[in-house]
Amino acid sequence: MAKQTNTLRIIAGEHRGRKLNFVDAPNLRPTPDRMRETLFNWLQPVIYDARCLDLFAGSGALGLEALSRGASGVVFVEKDAKAAQRLNENLQLLSYYNIKFQTKTDLTLFHGEPDLFY
């Protein structure tokens, strides 16, 4: 039996059709293409230049799609170190270098005054 390759596809925007790998983890289930397409069709009027928050980022499918469609920035929050590392590699592969990345495992990320509003 062939080993399954864990890939996600960017649906639209600058990186349309681009396939990216993500880690094989038992609880990691990227948002399916069709659901992402529907979600971003609804958000299309407001996604350009928006700041987005991808909580429990996992593969980063939602945040990567937002960036490809013109979001000005995304904060990815992911506690799994392997998933976070692969997501960071995918960001670099797509030439997204100034993206905020959090690996905190508790709510200390949200204590105090926010530096950005979403």
Describe every region a protein language model picked out.
Residues 1-118:
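Class I S-adenosyl-L-methionine-dependent methyltransferase catalytic core
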